[in-house]
Amino acid sequence: MKITMQEVAERCGVSKALVSRILNEDPTLRVTPATRKKVVEMAEQLNYQRNINAQALSMSRRQANIKQLRIGYLSFSSQKHIGHPYFSRIIEGIIDEAARSNTIVLVGMGMDDAQKQAENLLKEYADDPLDGMILLGRLDEKKLKRVVDRIARYVVCMNKGYDKKSDYVGTDASLSILPALEHLYKLGYKDYGLLYGGDDVRYETCVNWLRNHQLSVSPEWQIDGEFTLSVAQERVAKALEKYKPPRAIVASNDEMAIGCIRALQQAGYSVPEDVAVTGHDDILLAAYVEVPLTTVHVYKKELGRLATRMLLDRIQSGRKATIELEVSSKLVRRDSCGYKLRDKA
């Protein structure tokens, strides 16, 4: 029976990718002499026969002096966030930019079971670290930073505060919600509700801004929608059973805003005639819902591209200095804020 590379990897307790790079004599590989010796001896012991075509391709690449970099992206929030319209556009930018640069994107996952995922990542990449990693979203599990440090040589994070030696690119979450608030304020709204998600810096910004402008927001209309359409719709509907809605509701993302609009409409309220609603992110659906959503546009795909460029630059240059880059956002005015009604008034 023909021995596979996977069997060699399992016998050695390392990844298949590492076995491939050792047996194909990848000159860019950094691995301990003991691990290299262990893999080579196990392959010989099992009489493993390398794929001649693959070996020839590897050799031709070396001869052409082409180094194919290996990077990944990782979310420490949840696997469901990877498929979220916001993250999916960022990932699209990462993959597009990587494809332009002879770079393989090997890892892409969320951390539903953080401990299990950490163990899997260490098993796969600790002996053969990736050239770099892009971290999406907030770092919920601080202990997993040690894992990232072991599986990737360089890191670009998209939330501030990861560490002082990694590059950062992103949008200032604490400030990006302000254009929506200021727009509603200019339209004359005095009574507000807030839809947020957990530990949400946009929510904190909204509370402080409303307080500073002496505008009201009642406790019953400060609702945790968990950043999802369904939860926001359900909780807004429950609030509407007991309380009259405020004149304007500011949501920390578009999905919660859309869920809010649906709950209002099902309860007999009109948007924006009775209640104005704004979102954040400008996901594709925002422009195509029944009441097109006023929102803050974040340049998501460009963020992914920039993160990849920064990462590749650092890998290739080996620079020590870190870079912090913030990308601006902009208000997109659509029907849900009621500006057409106010302009006529």
Provide a role label for each language-model segment.
Residues 233, 237-345:
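Flexible loop/turn connectors
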Residues 1-62:
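N-terminal helix-turn-helix DNA-binding module of bacterial transcription factors
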Residues 62-182, 186, 239-241, 345:
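Alpha-helical recognition/docking segments in bacterial nutrient-uptake
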Residues 180-215, 219-220, 323-337:
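An alpha-beta-alpha
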Residues 127-136, 191-196, 222, 243-253, ...:
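Periplasmic-binding protein-like
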Residues 36, 84, 88-92, 200-207:
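Short, surface-exposed alpha-helical segments at coil->helix boundaries
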Residues 98-110, 191-194, 207-233:
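Short beta-strand elements in bilobed, periplasmic/extracellular small-molecule ligand-binding domains
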Residues 167-194, 204, 229-238, 298-316:
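Hydrophobic alpha-helical segments within soluble ligand-binding/sensing domains
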